[in-house]
A protein has these predicted regions:
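Conserved small-residue-rich beta-alpha loop and adjacent elements
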Residues: 29-77
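N-terminal Rossmann-like NAD(P)+-binding subdomain of aldehyde/semialdehyde dehydrogenases
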Residues: 1-31, 35-38
């Protein structure tokens, strides 16, 4: 189990968190495609507190899949 955690779980969790860290500056204040006479600005606001349920198998990557986007959006977990 420790061998698999080091080889898969830890690396995958780090990559997931790194991906959301890179993506966070690319999702705010986007301008949605509209007609020439309209402007639609996409804003995302934090929801607040996010609760996550993580299964026992590969717990780090499962937690990263849920925690990283919540933190990137400005929520607390």
């Amino acid at each position: 189990p420790v061998k698999y955690a080091r080889a898969v779980d830890v690396n995958s969790a780090a990559n997931c968190i790194r991906w959301y860290g890179e993506a966070v500056d690319k999702v705010y204040d986007e301008i949605a495609p509209t007609a020439d006479t309209a402007l639609a600005l996409i804003t995302r606001e934090p929801v607040g507190v996010v609760g996550v349920i993580v299964p026992w198998n590969y717990p780090m990557i499962m937690a990263a899949w849920k925690i990283a986007p919540a933190l990137a959006a400005g929520n607390s977990v």
